[in-house]
Regions:
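C-terminal "capping" alpha-helix adjacent to the active site of nucleotide-linked donor transferases
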Residues: 118-119, 126-142
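A short, well-ordered alpha-helix in the C-terminal region of glycosyltransferases
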Residues: 143-157
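A donor-sugar binding/catalytic signature common to diverse glycosyltransferases
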Residues: 69-110
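Nucleotide-sugar donor-binding patch of glycosyltransferase catalytic domains
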Residues: 100-128
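Donor-nucleotide binding loops and adjacent catalytic segments primarily
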Residues: 1-78, 109
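C-terminal alpha-helical cap of glycosyltransferases
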Residues: 156-182
Length: 182
């Protein structure tokens, strides 16, 4: 519903920057009717700080770990996350607009670069860019639709099963067992 935008901010156990600051930057672009769900993962300190700052704001829902995360991602107009492989792949498989923020150096920055280069996500390199990119995606549903279409072109919806099949086959090979045909 364009009148009630939903943004999900997933911090993860390793954090995704200063969550209270990120919340402060996202809330103004949501307006009075928008909603922000913040998932802090196992980062108890981030949850405590966010609760102190925003626990009484009806536009903000604060969560620790959420299992499964899929329903929250599917309900989001925009997902703000680091570019960890699991959450990013899950979001792209579902088809959710993504803004990457504060990726951890190494594989997450490589993931962010790949997602940005292939138009699968927007990468907010600064806090100001975070605000601008979330606002832009919320104002322009056609940009979200274009991003989701690119995600569906790149991401195999059956990738989880294929990965599991590879792992089973390789494990069986290491154990000297034959893998039954699927």
């Amino acid at each position: 519903d364009p009148a009630r935008p939903e943004v999900v901010l997933v911090g993860g156990s390793m954090g995704a920057g200063n969550l209270p600051e990120m919340i402060a930057r996202i809330l103004p672009v949501l307006g009075e009717n928008g909603h922000l769900t913040v998932v802090c993962g196992s980062n108890v300190d981030a949850l405590r700080r966010a609760t102190e700052a925003y626990g009484s704001d009806p536009r903000v829902s604060l969560r620790a770990q959420v299992t499964p995360l899929t329903p929250l991602i599917a309900a989001a107009d925009v997902l703000v996350t680091k570019s960890g492989g699991l959450t990013s792949t899950e979001a792209m498989t579902i088809g959710t607009a993504i803004v990457v923020s504060h990726p951890i150096a190494g594989c997450e920055t490589e993931n962010a670069r790949y997602m940005e280069d292939n138009e699968l996500a927007l990468w907010a390199h600064t806090d100001d860019e975070l605000t601008a990119k979330v606002a832009d995606l919320l104002r322009h549903p056609e940009k979200r639709a274009e991003m989701i279409a690119k995600q569906h072109e790149k991401i195999d919806p059956d990738c989880a099963r294929k990965i599991a099949d590879i792992l089973i086959r390789r494990t069986n090979e290491m154990m000297g067992r034959k893998t039954p045909d699927a």
